[in-house]
């Protein structure tokens, strides 16, 4: 619709859409078409839609059949009919009305254009934050707005000869007669000549400044200024330092914008429109409802508003030679506001409303949001080989795996299962294979497992706001009717397990499967594409689980003063400490020789997850060389003694040799330590195998 749309379509293989600025020549190429008789059509000149009496599109109007194609396939405006695609038919268009004999579906993608009487800035580039026009020109946004909406003008002598304003500025004294002569130029027939020579205002002034920019020189100057600011030391003045910091941030954004323009071969002056594209009629329809009433898209009314004001401005500039200059500038402002409303209604303040006080839906309103063209119409469509279900946590899954319910998996991979059934001579034809699938024979699940083994699936959670909204996983069959998801990938999807739903898609072609494996697998997207920080980090449920796992009740020895873990627990029938597994005459002070015994006791429900316990530990140099003073020392009759510290205990012999070390811990800490240890060992093995 605007000069931001550029569609590149490969009719044989791919379809893709690119959004960016395009040149007026490209807009003209989209809209204009040369008829077989040599006539050029494509410009929409009239603000009318249909003739009231005949219900036929107005010629050169918003629904003109000469510009956009016939309403009915093969039928022109006169009512003549030709067979589409018939090579025997010599005449491809009607000589009387100038309508081509083509398929009516052409009205869905053939565009038109409006030739604007004055340049108009694109409101997305001017008013959206950050303002690209203000950034690249390095001027305040309010100053540019005042210039665009004709609130003021600036002198711009475009020749080396002395002009009226330049000569006036060179003189040291004021000539009173000049003051009275200036307004005369705005009411005479020579106003256009005077304005074009002496002053500049409106979007044309912005376009001239953008056209004069040399992007590479601008990039070099911005880089030099940024380096100079970086070399300056702090002045000690907080306000000045903040000002310099803001300037550096602005220069970085400006350089990124200039690099984008250079990389994509976009000229900055294209941000100012001279031609306004007109959407195909099928995308802004007029529908007749019961009772003969017509329902029209709001876009049509906004287009009519633009054409009315543009035609008025054209008449003022061409036919009325004695038009006051102030009236011309006022009309240019109205054209600018009409285009702003068409592109983004309400961006400048109060939105435009119809007779029923309803806000008009502009182009931005149509494409943005949850109910916009992209998210609802394009991304929200139901497609083949896809399913949808609620997500739940899958703690036993690997990072690259997802749990797929049997009911969904058999439907998604049914063609592949049928192919393997016939290939293995387990079914004679497709009908027999489908019958086996409906009966859910055991062989079906075995074949399904083999099919899924090397076939990734794509999981998507709406809204898809960035690249990590769609990721690839290796499917694993699970029971139930919900999709199981590893909790570490939730942040990329912005998902949680409170009822969120996700869609699953099966990539069919080899290219799609290769793309999923090489670029989209979850274990290959561990960093945020925006800022580079880790995105696969524990969140929500995992943080709560880690908190519960590592919570403790009176873990320190000083807290319970040995009442829950009497040191004499170590004195058992045998003095062989290495064979003692579970020796606890008290309720809360068990001693364990290894972590397996502690976890086994927890599984037998003999101890709790957060209950303190003593775990025999290997001789740790950090413990041996610790300078911590023992809280108490217990001596035994056999000569051994026990040094009791805050979180560990040392058993020494008569010769002060360390026999055993016991750590004060919980089952939760033991489990977390074992998981971390196994992960590090697995990483070390993978690293050694690669090297």
UniProtKB/Swiss-Prot annotation:
Gene Ontology molecular function terms on file = DNA binding; DNA-directed RNA polymerase activity; magnesium ion binding; zinc ion binding
Gene Ontology biological process terms in this record:
DNA-templated transcription
Cell division found in the keyword field: no
Function of the protein: DNA-dependent RNA polymerase catalyzes the transcription of DNA into RNA using the four ribonucleoside triphosphates as substrates.
- GO CC annotations on file: DNA-directed RNA polymerase complex; mitochondrion; plastid
Tell me what this protein is called: DNA-directed RNA polymerase subunit beta'
The record's subcellular location field reads: Plastid
Indicate the enzyme's highest-level EC class. transferase
Tell me the cofactor note: Binds 1 Mg(2+) ion per subunit. Binds 1 Zn(2+) ion per subunit.
The residues listed in the UniProt record as binding Zn(2+), with positions renumbered to this chain, are 76, 78, 94, 97
Where along the sequence do coiled-coil regions lie?
A: none
Q: Tell me the keywords, alphabetical order.
A: DNA-directed RNA polymerase, Magnesium, Metal-binding, Nucleotidyltransferase, Plastid, Transcription, Transferase, Zinc
Principal localisation? plastid
- Source organism's superkingdom? Eukaryota
User: EC annotation?
Assistant: 2.7.7.6
Reaction(s) catalyzed by this protein?
Answer: RNA(n) + a ribonucleoside 5'-triphosphate = RNA(n+1) + diphosphate
> Which residues bind Mg(2+) per the record?
496, 498, 500
Q: Which cofactor does it need?
A: Mg(2+); Zn(2+)
Q: Could you say which protein family the record assigns here? A: Belongs to the RNA polymerase beta' chain family. RpoC1 subfamily.
């Amino acid at each position: 619709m605007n000069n931001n749309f550029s569609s590149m379509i490969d009719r044989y293989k791919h379809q893709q859409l690119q959004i960016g600025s395009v040149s007026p020549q490209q807009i003209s190429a989209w809209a204009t078409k040369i008829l077989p008789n040599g006539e050029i059509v494509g410009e929409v000149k009239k603000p009318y839609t249909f003739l009231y009496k005949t219900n036929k599109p107005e010629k050169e109007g918003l629904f003109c059949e000469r510009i956009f194609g016939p309403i009915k396939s093969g039928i022109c405006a006169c009512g003549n009919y030709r067979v589409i695609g018939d090579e025997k038919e010599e005449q491809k268009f009607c000589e009387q009305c100038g309508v081509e004999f083509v398929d009516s579906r052409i009205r869905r993608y053939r565009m038109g254009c409006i030739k604007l009487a004055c340049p108009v800035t694109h409101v997305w580039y001017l008013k959206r934050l950050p303002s690209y026009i203000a950034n690249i020109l390095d001027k305040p946004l309010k100053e540019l707005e005042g210039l665009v909406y004709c609130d003021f003008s600036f002198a711009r002598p475009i020749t080396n000869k002395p002009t009226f304003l330049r000569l006036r500025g060179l003189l040291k004294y004021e000539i009173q007669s000049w003051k009275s002569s200036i307004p005369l130029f705005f009411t005479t027939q020579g106003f256009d000549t005077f304005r074009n020579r002496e002053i500049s205002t409106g979007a044309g002034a912005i376009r001239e400044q953008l056209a004069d920019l040399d992007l590479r020189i601008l990039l070099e100057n911005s880089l030099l200024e940024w380096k100079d600011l970086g070399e300056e030391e702090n002045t000690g003045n907080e306000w000045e330092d903040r000002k310099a910091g803001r300037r550096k941030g602005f220069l970085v954004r400006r350089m990124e914008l200039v690099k984008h323009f250079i990389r994509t071969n976009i000229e900055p002056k294209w941000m100012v429109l001279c031609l306004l594209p007109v959407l195909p009629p099928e995308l802004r329809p007029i529908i007749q409802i019961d009772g003969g009433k017509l329902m029209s898209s709001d876009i049509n009314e906004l287009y009519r508003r633009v054409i009315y004001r543009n035609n008025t401005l054209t008449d003022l500039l061409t036919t009325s030679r004695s038009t006051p200059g102030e009236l011309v500038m006022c009309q240019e402002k109205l054209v600018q506001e009409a285009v702003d409303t068409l592109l983004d209604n309400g961006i400048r303040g109060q939105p435009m409303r119809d007779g029923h006080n309803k806000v008009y839906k502009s182009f931005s309103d149509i494409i943005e949001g949850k109910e916009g063209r992209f998210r609802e119409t394009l991304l929200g469509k139901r497609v083949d080989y896809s399913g949808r279900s609620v997500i739940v946590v899958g703690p036993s899954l690997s990072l690259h795996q997802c749990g797929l319910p049997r009911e969904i998996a058999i439907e998604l991979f049914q063609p592949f299962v049928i192919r393997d059934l016939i290939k293995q001579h387990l079914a004679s034809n497709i009908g027999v294979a489908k019958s086996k699938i409906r009966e859910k024979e055991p062989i079906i699940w075995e074949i399904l497992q083999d099919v899924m083994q090397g076939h990734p699936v794509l999981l998507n959670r709406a809204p898809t706001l960035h690249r990590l909204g769609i990721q690839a996983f290796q499917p694993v069959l699970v029971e139930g009717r919900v999709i199981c998801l590893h909790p570490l990938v939730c942040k990329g999807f912005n998902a949680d397990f409170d009822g969120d739903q996700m869609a699953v898609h099966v990539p069919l072609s080899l290219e799609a499967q290769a793309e999923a494996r090489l670029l989209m697998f979850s274990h290959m997207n561990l960093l945020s594409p925006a800022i580079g920080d880790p995105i696969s980090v524990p969140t929500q449920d995992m943080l709560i689980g880690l908190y519960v796992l590592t919570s403790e009740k009176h873990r320190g020895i000083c807290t319970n003063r040995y009442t829950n873990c009497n040191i004499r627990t170590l004195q058992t029938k045998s003095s062989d400490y290495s064979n003692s597994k579970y020796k606890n005459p008290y309720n809360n002070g068990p001693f364990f020789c290894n972590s397996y015994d502690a976890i086994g006791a927890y599984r037998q429900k003999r101890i709790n997850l957060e209950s303190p316990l003593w775990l025999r530990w290997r001789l740790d140099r950090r413990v041996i060389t610790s300078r911590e003073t023992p809280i108490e020392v217990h001596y035994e009759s056999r000569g051994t003694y026990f040094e009791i510290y805050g979180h560990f205990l040392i058993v020494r012999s008569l010769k002060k040799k360390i026999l055993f070390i016991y750590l004060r811990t919980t089952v939760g800490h033991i489990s977390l330590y074992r998981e971390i240890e196994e992960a590090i060992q697995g990483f070390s093995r993978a690293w050694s195998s690669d090297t």
